[in-house]
Amino acid sequence: MDNDNEILFVYGTLTNPAERMRLLGRAIIASPAQLAGYARGQKRYYFVAKQSGAITKGAILEGLTTRDLKILDNYEEVPTLYTRDRIEVVAADGAHIECWIYLPTDWATA
């Protein structure tokens, strides 16, 4: 049985509702959130990299299933381009939330 309570922080293409609908076949609500200590950059794809004092604005996607994460892992080319790791973000209401994030492999800093 799938876990339907997975949370993912997104900061690039997956912030687009149409892209999420195309990939997952259903609407996923996104709530504003921030990731402290990371700056967003872009080469061929968006990425975040550790940077003291930086804040990356993005969104948290809640109610994702294990199946959804597998689809998104494939889309993000895990483990070639990204890894899916746990991280803490701050929601718009100030709550600290532990969630998944896609972090780049070496391509972003090379």
Where are these regions (language model features)?
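Glycine-aromatic micro-motifs
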Residues: M1-A110
